[in-house]
């Protein structure tokens, strides 16, 4: 005969907080074990990239608070908040903007020297 199962908690509905799995006890009984909700890794701060950040543990917020800092970020500029591709693009953009400023300054200096002659 099949053993009947009952929830161990008061909630009797199939909600996300009431998910269970079957487990066999040493006394050969089958009981419900309550499973924890799965966490999600954070998204990139840029808002453009669709995926989740790599190298960061995907856990619930309460567990994330208890983790050490090495498990919450990667050792890179903007590690733990932006993905590597976005950081690379941001560095390139900043470099090109600085180069453009230098070019403008040089052109202005050349124009000044032309007027002086």
Curated annotation (Swiss-Prot):
The gene is rpl34. Component of the large ribosomal subunit. Pfam families: Ribosomal_L34e. PROSITE patterns: RIBOSOMAL_L34E. It is found in: Cytoplasm, Cytosol; Cytoplasm; Endoplasmic reticulum. InterPro entries: Ribosomal_eL34 (IPR008195), Ribosomal_eL34_C_sf (IPR038562), Ribosomal_eL34_CS (IPR018065). Keywords: Cytoplasm, Endoplasmic reticulum, Ribonucleoprotein, Ribosomal protein. GO terms for cellular component: cytosol; endoplasmic reticulum; ribonucleoprotein complex; ribosome. One of its GO terms (biological process) is translation. One of its GO terms (molecular function) is structural constituent of ribosome. This is Large ribosomal subunit protein eL34. Belongs to the eukaryotic ribosomal protein eL34 family. It comes from Ictalurus punctatus (Channel catfish). It comes from the Eukaryota. Gene3D superfamilies: 6.20.340.10, 6.20.370.70. Component of the large ribosomal subunit. The ribosome is a large ribonucleoprotein complex responsible for the synthesis of proteins in the cell.
